[in-house]
Amino acid sequence: MLSPKRTKYRKYHRGRMRGKATRGNEVTFGDYGLQALEPTWITSRQIEAARRTITRYTKRGAALWIRIFPDKTVTARAAESRMGSGKGAVDYWVAVVKPGTILFEIASVPEEIAATALHLASYKLPIKTKFITRIKI
């Protein structure tokens, strides 16, 4: 699972996901990408499940870039614990994703294989996504 080696703070505020992505919204490294169409938190487990799906379908023949990183902690309290006594313990890590963010990029495979691999990976994610190609200049 992905998680930072160290962070400035152990626990973070939830925050809000307003507006569209202004950064990380173009295919930069690969030839094809998977773009988010909705705002959400994507957990490190979901990222890993999607990554495994892509690498298995392409038979490890594709170059893969994961464009999001889970750098925010989500805390949870123990079941049946009373209110108060501070914030809960860190439960898992999430990446904050806005609409338009590129989640994964692929290169070195034909377009139909890339499209199918990213489509299969999209089933592992909790949002609607779109397959996009790089704009060649």
Curated annotation (Swiss-Prot):
CDD domains: Ribosomal_L16_L10e (cd01433). Its main location: plastid. InterPro entries: Ribosomal_uL16, Ribosomal_uL16_bact-type, Ribosomal_uL16_CS, Ribosomal_uL16_dom, Ribosomal_uL16_sf. GO terms for biological process: mitochondrial translation. The keyword Iron does not apply. GO terms for cellular component: chloroplast; mitochondrial large ribosomal subunit. Keywords: Chloroplast, Plastid, Ribonucleoprotein, Ribosomal protein. NCBIfam families: rplP_bact. Part of the 50S ribosomal subunit. This is Large ribosomal subunit protein uL16c. It comes from Trieres chinensis (Marine centric diatom).
